[in-house]
From Swiss-Prot:
GO terms for molecular function: rRNA binding; structural constituent of ribosome; tRNA binding. Binds directly to 23S rRNA. The L1 stalk is quite mobile in the ribosome, and is involved in E site tRNA release. Gene3D superfamilies: 3.30.190.20, 3.40.50.790. It comes from the Bacteria. Keywords: Repressor, Ribonucleoprotein, Ribosomal protein, RNA-binding, rRNA-binding, Translation regulation, tRNA-binding. This is Large ribosomal subunit protein uL1. HAMAP family: Ribosomal_uL1_B (MF_01318_B). Part of the 50S ribosomal subunit. One of its GO terms (biological process) is translation. Belongs to the universal ribosomal protein uL1 family. InterPro entries: Ribosom_uL1_bac-type, Ribosomal_uL1, Ribosomal_uL1-like, Ribosomal_uL1/biogenesis, Ribosomal_uL1_3-a/b-sand, Ribosomal_uL1_CS. One of its GO terms (cellular component) is cytosolic large ribosomal subunit.
């Protein structure tokens, strides 16, 4: 642990916590700090100008990252008949109805995301206490309850990420891996920011995107100058 601590301290010394870094410099620093033996994730934290305690200011949604997430995703789908076949053809690993519900109740959850056709919610609704705490409960707001299950599966496989503001008004999301090229990370970040802008509550006043910071799994936070995000 001491070795990791010393490395983290060395990286922290390179980063000015008060400075706003141009996006290119921020990505360069974050990638440099990602020196663990595994391919660290590159994460973003976005402080929003909303009151997270108000139900009409809860920011939630999903976005397909153009460069993907660098993670292989296993998808489970609640569907029947033709929609079940479409889900399988789109690449879903697990497709079912009551049988899938029983697997979940038995603790067999070898998947990363759950998608449901609207007509299956009578079954899915009984799984709220199991799927909810794990962040797996299908929801129309993030596109996981939809009649077009095939597209939902394809989006999940293509690098879709879900986001939801926490109690502190912050959005946390992964935009790729340390092995990604800076251009890929930047395009993913831009896609996320665009999605957040579209999800801005009508009742939100003042500055909406207050702070943006990047970090790797084992690295330190680097603040981003938002003005440089718009520059091409």
């Amino acid at each position: 642990m001491a070795k990791i601590s010393k490395r983290r301290q060395a990286f922290a010394a390179k980063v000015d916590r008060q400075k706003l870094y141009a996006i290119e410099d921020a990505l360069s620093l974050v990638k440099e700090c990602a020196s663990a033996k595994f391919d660290e994730s590159i994460d973003v934290a976005v402080q929003l100008g909303i009151d997270a305690k108000k139900s009409d200011q809860v920011v939630r949604g999903s976005v397909v990252l153009p460069a993907g997430t660098g993670k292989s995703v296993r998808v489970a789908v609640f569907a029947q008949g033709e929609k079940a076949e479409q889900a399988r053809a789109a690449g879903a690993e697990i497709v079912g109805m009551e049988d899938l519900a029983e697997q979940i109740k038995a603790g067999q959850m070898d998947f990363d995301i759950v998608i449901a056709s609207p007509d299956t919610m009578r079954i899915v609704g009984t799984l709220g206490q199991i799927l909810g705490p794990r962040g797996l409960m299908p929801n129309p707001k993030v596109g996981t309850v939809t009649p077009d299950v095939a597209t939902a599966v394809k989006n999940a496989k293509a690098g879709q990420v879900q986001f939801r503001v926490d109690k502190a008004g912050i959005i946390h999301a992964t935009i790729g891996r340390a092995s990604f090229e800076p251009t890929a990370l930047r395009s993913n970040l831009s896609a996320l920011i665009e999605a957040l802008q579209k999800a801005k509550p009508a009742t939100s006043k003042g500055v909406y995107l207050r702070k943006i910071a990047l970090s790797s799994t084992m690295g330190v936070g680097v603040r981003v100058d938002q003005a440089t995000l718009a520059a091409q």
